[in-house]
Amino acid sequence: MNGDEQLEALRARITELDRAIFELVNQRLELVRELKQVKVDHDLPFVDPAREASMIEQRVAENPGPLSKDGVRSFYVTLLALVKRELG
């Protein structure tokens, strides 16, 4: 396999992973939408900063790498902000 073929194969795999990531993010968003409705039905606040912090630290602890601890934190802070924007 020459260099161009290797690049194309790697790029194709990255595209597959990107699609899988978006599928999972959309599934997560739907679950959070359901969770939000349960919270609304029970007069609970949508955002729970203590729960968010705990969840982020759990994901940091579970991360096998190579993504750094700071990278995991940044990813989840961004993901949670996105979900809040999407769901209001």
Question: What do the PLM-derived regions correspond to, one by one?
Answer:
Residues 1-88:
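Domain-level signature for soluble enzymes in the chorismate/prephenate branch of the shikimate pathway
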